[in-house]
A protein has these predicted regions:
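Sec-dependent signal peptide recognition
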Residues: 2-10
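Residue-level marker of regulatory loop/turn positions in helix-turn-helix DNA-binding domains and
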Residues: 6, 45, 222
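N-terminal hydrophobic or amphipathic segments with adjacent small-residue motifs
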Residues: 10, 102, 162-163, 194, ...
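C-terminal motif of bacterial Sec signal peptides marking the signal peptidase cleavage site
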Residues: 13-16
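Acidic, Gly/Ser/Thr-rich repeat motifs that build Ca2+-stabilized beta-propeller blades
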Residues: 19-181, 290-322, 340-353, 358-370
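Beta-propeller domain segments
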Residues: 22-35, 107-109, 119, 186-324, ...
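Short, surface-exposed beta-strand/loop micro-motifs that present aromatic residues
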Residues: 169-170, 333-335
Length: 373
């Protein structure tokens, strides 16, 4: 039976979340459109000039994914809503799903991406966690927007391993027109090395949910394996695929992904090296924790949302340098770059942050001053 999802989800997720980070109260306010505001907290590090941060929308409720078409934003909230933001107006749209949305700590309505023909079809793709009599799982589905409500349509992929932690969840359509999904190991590290499991993988599928004929393993959605909890995915202008991945306490990773390769977890992590396994392009090792989530690419650099790092991190693919571009705004869940502008969402209402007034928020910042877009 279809479920109309409730905002009570936030109270449930706070009671079920991990205790390794400070928890804060949930936000039950309606989203609002903020007046332009220059935040002194959004700043560059390493002596760089401060960036002017504009707040686009406030009172978001555990936002997880940013989708955008023209001047319209669609923000997926983990409790099971889509917030539409357009021309200074907002609307929190309900989502009706075929399965009961899980309220576990890191589960819920996660990845969300608009179909290429969305203006005509009103179709989007979503990754969500659910619970039934057989257990907890993740699935990839289409959502159809009608009369301000998103309804589950086609089931593309089901029974992706799920648990209170390590659900992965990012969805993106690649330059090849295929749908990619990041999946976590569901707190069972062994499945990341199991070629028959959908957990701990980067998955690749056609937009109708079928398996592409050129996937690296016959009759398999698996594109790469040996991942712990990847939550970010992006492509450079030469179509190179990159992902961001949560490490075990530390040892977070930014990886360059190639079809069919093994990225090591749980055999190696961070700076460790072993034949037949790929070590990351960037990692803090065991000395720091980023908790990286959504990511995007711009001008030779990767921009990564950091939850524990409480920043937007920039990784220069040519020089190997890395720095904080934005900091001081708390946990950051997702980023999106378009026309030289970086958009990002805070995630301080997820039960692990310390929410300030009117959080969470959608922000905007110009990446370079040679463009006034």
């Amino acid at each position: 039976m279809k479920q109309v999802l409730s905002m009570l989800f936030v109270l449930l997720l706070i009671s079920g979340c991990s205790t390794d980070e400070q928890q804060g109260p949930a936000n039950d306010q309606q989203p609002t459109i903020a007046e332009q505001e220059n935040s002194p907290n959004g700043q560059e590090t390493d002596g760089q000039e401060e960036k002017s941060v504009e707040v686009i929308a406030e009172n978001l409720m555990v936002p997880w994914s940013i989708a955008k078409l023209g001047n319209t934003f669609y923000i997926a909230e983990r409790p099971g809503n889509i917030v539409k933001i357009e021309n200074g107006e907002f609307e929190r749209q309900g989502v009706e799903l075929e399965k009961e949305l899980s309220t576990a700590s890191e589960a819920g309505l996660l990845g969300f991406v608009l179909a290429p023909d969305f203006p005509e079809s009103n179709v989007a793709y979503s990754y969500y966690s659910y619970e039934d009599s057989f257990g907890q799982f993740n699935r990839v589905v289409t959502l159809y927007l009608e009369d301000g409500v998103w309804r589950e349509g086609n089931l593309l992929l089901d029974k992706i391993p799920s648990a209170p932690w390590h659900d992965g969840g990012r969805l993106k359509i690649g330059p090849d027109g295929k749908l990619y999904a990041t999946t976590g190991d569901a707190s069972n590290s062994a499945i990341a090395q199991d070629p028959n499991s959908l957990g701990g993988k980067i998955l690749r599928m056609n937009l109708d949910g079928s398996i592409p004929s050129d996937n690296p393993f016959p009759n398999s959605y698996v594109f790469s394996y040996g991942h712990r909890n990847p939550q970010g995915i992006a492509w450079s202008t030469d179509d190179t695929l990159y992902t961001s991945e949560h490490g075990n306490n530390a040892n977070d990773e930014v990886n360059e992904i190639e079809a069919g390769l093994n990225y090591g977890w749980p055999i190696i992590e961070g700076k460790e090296v072993q034949e037949g396994m790929v070590s990351p392009l960037f990692t803090p090792g065991d000395g720091a924790t980023w908790a990286p989530s959504g990511m995007d690419y711009f001008d030779g650099k990767l921009y990564v949302a950091a939850l524990r790092g409480s920043a937007v991190l920039e990784f220069d693919l040519e020089t190997g340098d890395q720095r904080e571009v934005i900091s001081g705004l708390g946990r950051v869940r997702d980023v999106r770059i378009e026309d030289n502008v970086l958009y990002f969402i805070s995630n301080n209402t997820d039960g692990r942050g310390v929410p300030q007034e009117n959080e969470d928020k959608l922000y905007k910042v110009l990446l370079s001053e040679d463009d006034d877009s």
